[in-house]
């Protein structure tokens, strides 16, 4: 067996990006969960991710392991994600990748384990890491399941996204609502444009709430998403982003906007819907529990103890 080699790069070339994308696909098929987030997938192709560094581990010129490191900014630590080719597992590649990104990213670096699979838990234990953040995936059925009636609150108007003219308000509310969030809170027009270019994008699935007294200042929005059928897995909807401006919270807008999206997804014929929520977001968890969502799996960000 030949010795594998690690190397860092600020940008993957075309062949590397294709090989990494294929590796991520194999890992997803083997594990039942994607090892890298949507933002990370964009960074692989070079479409996004300022400052992202890529670590590849090769064996005989074949990429057998991949990690990416998103630099820290302000109070937010550096974040890393990684994947090991299913055919190359059991050789310590995952542990080496984690050790290297922790060294490169600094003492507060966090490493995502999507699905928190047993192999990831074993690496974390071996390296003395502890869970620093949890991201929960919740799901609920749509087909054959009741949804509360959608009743628009008094003094509130709902409409859908009209195009780039809405972007400044969407980005303003997003930044304010997710100021604490190292990934979501840093969105710019580039992230908006990337998502508008995706095959799943549908302006009719982005719901926006305004006060009837001021229909230029956005109070909150709910962006839905549809994941297409993959193999035996049917298409599924997603509560992609729900953002409520700090000055509009506590008025029931989160529930209203979520329900608007759920009705839309059900009307499209989808059988189920998923969402992601921080494990310590008690308010959101309470809202989603009342709407019939249940925990499906957990992503854990590990850090040095």
Swiss-Prot record:
EC number, as in UniProt: 2.3.1.189
Alphabetically ordered keywords of this record: Acyltransferase, Repeat, Transferase
Name of the top EC class for this enzyme: transferase
Q: Which residues form the signal peptide?
A: none
Short name of any one Pfam family annotated for the protein: Acetyltransf_1
Q: Which domain of life is it from?
A: Bacteria
The chain's coiled-coil residues are none
Give the binding site residues for 1D-myo-inositol 2-(L-cysteinylamino)-2-deoxy-alpha-D-glucopyranoside: 38, 183, 225, 238, 276
**Which positions fall inside the N-acetyltransferase domain?**
10-154, 156-305
Q: Output the GO biological process annotations, alphabetical, semicolon-separated.
A: mycothiol biosynthetic process
Which residues of the sequence carry a binding annotation for acetyl-CoA 1?
A: 82-84
User: According to its UniProt record, which reaction does this protein catalyse?
Assistant: 1D-myo-inositol 2-(L-cysteinylamino)-2-deoxy-alpha-D-glucopyranoside + acetyl-CoA = mycothiol + CoA + H(+)
Q: Which NCBIfam families match?
A: mycothiol_MshD
Say what the protein does: Catalyzes the transfer of acetyl from acetyl-CoA to desacetylmycothiol (Cys-GlcN-Ins) to form mycothiol.
Name the protein family.
Belongs to the acetyltransferase family. MshD subfamily.
> Could you give the subunit structure recorded for this chain?
Monomer.
Please identify the protein, giving its name as recorded: Mycothiol acetyltransferase
> What organism is recorded for this protein?
Rhodococcus opacus (strain B4)
């Amino acid at each position: 067996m030949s010795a594998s080699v690690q190397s860092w790069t600020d940008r993957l070339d075309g062949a590397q990006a294709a090989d990494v994308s294929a590796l991520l696909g194999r890992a997803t098929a083997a594990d039942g969960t994607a090892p890298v987030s949507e933002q990370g997938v964009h960074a692989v192709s070079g479409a996004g991710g300022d400052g992202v560094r890529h670590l590849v581990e090769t064996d005989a010129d074949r990429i057998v392991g991949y990690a990416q490191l998103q630099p820290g900014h302000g109070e937010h630590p550096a974040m890393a994600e990684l994947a090991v080719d299913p055919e190359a597992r059991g050789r310590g590649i995952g542990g080496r990748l984690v050790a290297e990104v922790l060294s490169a990213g600094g003492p507060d670096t966090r490493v995502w384990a999507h699905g928190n699979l047993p192999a990831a838990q074993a690496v974390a234990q071996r390296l003395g890491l502890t869970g620093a953040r949890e991201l929960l995936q919740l799901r609920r059925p749509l087909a054959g399941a009741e949804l509360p009636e959608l009743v628009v609150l008094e003094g509130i108007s709902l409409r859908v996204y009209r195009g780039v003219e809405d972007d400044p308000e969407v980005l303003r509310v997003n930044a304010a609502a997710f100021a604490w969030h190292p990934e979501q809170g840093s969105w710019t027009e580039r992230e908006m444009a990337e998502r508008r270019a995706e095959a799943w994008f549908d302006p009719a699935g982005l719901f926006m709430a305004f006060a009837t007294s001021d229909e230029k200042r956005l109070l909150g929005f709910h962006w839905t998403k549809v994941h297409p059928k993959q193999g035996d897995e049917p298409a599924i909807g997603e509560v992609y982003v729900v953002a409520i401006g700090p000055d509009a919270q506590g008025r029931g807008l989160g529930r209203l906007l979520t329900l608007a999206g759920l009705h839309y997804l059900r009307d499209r014929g989808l059988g189920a819907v998923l969402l992601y929520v921080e494990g310590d977001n008690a308010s959101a968890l309470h809202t989603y529990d009342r709407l019939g969502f249940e925990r499906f799996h957990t992503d854990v960000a590990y850090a040095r103890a």
